[in-house]
Swiss-Prot record:
GO biological process: 'de novo' pyrimidine nucleobase biosynthetic process; 'de novo' UMP biosynthetic process; glutamine metabolic process; L-arginine biosynthetic process
Signal peptide as annotated in the record: none
PANTHER family named in the record: CARBAMOYL-PHOSPHATE SYNTHASE SMALL CHAIN, MULTIFUNCTIONAL TRYPTOPHAN BIOSYNTHESIS PROTEIN-RELATED
Pathway in which the depicted protein is active: Amino-acid biosynthesis; L-arginine biosynthesis; carbamoyl phosphate from bicarbonate: step 1/1; Pyrimidine metabolism; UMP biosynthesis via de novo pathway; (S)-dihydroorotate from bicarbonate: step 1/3
Function, in words: Small subunit of the glutamine-dependent carbamoyl phosphate synthetase (CPSase). CPSase catalyzes the formation of carbamoyl phosphate from the ammonia moiety of glutamine, carbonate, and phosphate donated by ATP, constituting the first step of 2 biosynthetic pathways, one leading to arginine and/or urea and the other to pyrimidine nucleotides. The small subunit (glutamine amidotransferase) binds and cleaves glutamine to supply the large subunit with the substrate ammonia.
Domain Glutamine amidotransferase type-1: 178-370
Annotated protein name in UniProt: Carbamoyl phosphate synthase small chain
Amino acids binding L-glutamine: 48, 226, 228, 260, 263, 301, 303-304
InterPro entries attached to this UniProt entry: Anth_synth/Amidotransfase, CarbamoylP_synth_ssu, CarbamoylP_synth_ssu_N, CarbP_synth_ssu_N_sf, Class_I_gatase-like, CPSase_GATase1, GATASE
Any one GO molecular function term: carbamoyl-phosphate synthase (glutamine-hydrolyzing) activity
PROSITE patterns noted in UniProt: GATASE_TYPE_1
Catalytic activity: hydrogencarbonate + L-glutamine + 2 ATP + H2O = carbamoyl phosphate + L-glutamate + 2 ADP + phosphate + 2 H(+)
Length: 371
């Protein structure tokens, strides 16, 4: 197979030369790495990766192809996929095509044949950086200048880019609960997990006023994952503040947040967030449940975190990351509100934290009993 030469140039001038697959062109974004061994299709279709180019640390990617059921959204959101070796052969009974063709049809670039271990070490040491991949412009200095012009992730609201434009409902035949989900970049497996928990789910645009959500008479409200800087999503923070005020004055509506939703809920109650050096991206992060002292292996995908020292008196930390001692979960001491930084629905990843969806339904049951 003929290979098209391509380069990745980082904002600090580092150059990685390989070959392009998927779409042949030029693209840019923040370069981050993911330590999952499998799940590349779920990763590139996760809206949380909007504006980012993902480096897979596992050396061989594409060997089991792609299929529609593994997609976490309707399109590829990652700006590019960077791998050590791209498999030209896929073997999987469920595969409907190759990763190369999948990226090509979506006009998304891939870069292979580079030293991904060296690249990941550089990101770990220096932090996530902006970069440009090009198969059409060989001028490294010009590509470096293009990388420097890419907006930094700090201060960037990408939720507006990925959120649904229309309200839609996912029915459940044996539904016992009605959940309103704010779509900041929601993954399909989250919706499946809510369905499995016997929830009918109404999905709203991220900018929908909380008053409109409450008119739907939900049993609970869910705050989804999503991309970008949580501090920039001011309309979502204001919505959660209004919901908290509603919950103190009227019948409380339970609230559950995941990833960006966790950060937004924490900000609404007075905590602060900050950008991690290179983020948490992978399916093997150990998290300690501070109540049970059990250890959960979790799937994570976030570049920002809640500052532990900023947690207000009203919030209690419930989960702790054992890699870097960062906040992985909080709950409100008086209101029926809780959130986690990681992805209990996984996809890809372990299932250690599925119990959190049961915790959400138990909270909704209790709210019904207290009416």
């Amino acid at each position: 197979m003929q290979q098209t030469p391509a380069k990745l140039v980082l904002e600090n001038g580092s150059v990685y030369t390989g070959y392009a697959f998927g779409h042949i062109g030029e693209t840019g974004g923040e370069v981050v790495f993911n330590t999952a061994l499998t799940g590349y299709q779920e990763i590139v279709t996760d809206p949380s990766y909007a504006g980012q180019m993902v480096v897979m640390t596992y050396p061989l990617i594409g060997n089991y192809g792609v299929n529609q059921s593994d997609a976490e959204s309707q399109k590829i959101w990652a700006s590019a996929l960077i791998v050590r070796e791209m498999s030209n052969i896929h073997s999987n009974f469920a595969a409907t095509g190759s990763l190369d063709q999948y990226l090509k049809e979506a006009k998304v670039m891939g870069l292979a044949g580079i030293d991904t271990r060296k690249l990941v070490r550089e990101i770990r040491q220096k932090g996530a950086m902006r970069g440009v991949i090009s198969a059409i412009d060989p001028d490294e200095k010009r590509l470096e200048e293009k990388a420097l012009k890419i907006p930094e992730m700090t201060g960037l609201d990408l939720v507006k880019k990925v959120s649904t434009s229309q309200t839609y409902t996912i029915d459940c035949d044996d539904a016992e609960y009605h959940v309103v989900a704010y779509d900041y970049g929601i993954k399909q497996n989250i919706l499946r997990m809510l369905q499995n928990a016997k929830c009918k789910v109404t999905v709203l645009n991220a900018n929908t006023p909380i008053e409109e959500a409450l008119k739907l008479d939900p049993d609970g409200i869910f705050l989804s994952n999503g991309p970008g800087d949580p501090f920039a999503v001011t309309y979502a923070i204001d919505n959660i503040k209004k919901l908290a005020e509603h919950n103190t004055q009227q019948k409380p509506v339970p609230l559950f947040g995941i990833c960006l939703g966790h950060q937004l809920m924490s900000l609404a109650f007075g905590a602060k967030t900050y950008k991690l050096k290179f983020g948490h991206h992978g399916s093997n992060h150990p998290v300690k449940n501070l109540k049970s002292s059990s250890i959960e292996i979790t799937s994570q995908n976030h570049g920002f975190a809640v500052a532990m020292e900023s947690l207000p008196e009203s919030l209690e930390m419930t989960h702790l990351n054992l890699y870097d001692q960062t906040v992985e979960g909080v709950r409100h001491k008086k209101l029926p509100c809780f959130s986690v930084q990681y992805h209990p629905e996984a996809a890809p990843g372990p299932h250690d934290s599925h119990y959190l969806f049961e915790q959400f339904t138990a909270m909704m049951d209790q709210a019904k009993e207290n009416v």
